[in-house]
Swiss-Prot record:
Its main location: plastid. It comes from the Eukaryota. The lineage of its organism: Eukaryota, Haptista, Haptophyta, Prymnesiophyceae, Isochrysidales. Belongs to the bacterial ribosomal protein bL31 family. Type A subfamily. One of its GO terms (cellular component) is ribonucleoprotein complex. Part of the 50S ribosomal subunit. It holds the Pfam family Ribosomal_L31. This is Large ribosomal subunit protein bL31c. Binds the 23S rRNA.
Length: 70
């Protein structure tokens, strides 16, 4: 016989909040979840991501180890 009452309660409509706003409902072991970042406000998914690369990694490596580029 399996042990009873060893599994956590399952909430099929757990509410996910981000900055106090309901963003989605999911299945979880807690009735409410609070997240800081989700796909609706993450820069990668919203298209507002900026890549700041003042010096390329290869060029920095070559300069650091004194290698000549050809």
């Amino acid at each position: 016989m399996p042990k009873s009452a060893i599994h956590p309660d399952w909430y099929p409509n757990a509410k996910v909040y981000c900055d106090g706003q309901l963003v989605m409902k999911v299945g979880a072991t807690k009735p409410t979840l609070n997240v800081d970042i989700w796909s609706g406000n993450h820069p990668f998914y919203t298209g507002s991501q900026t890549i700041i690369d003042t010096e390329g990694r290869v060029e920095r490596f070559m300069r650091k180890y004194g290698m000549e580029t050809q």
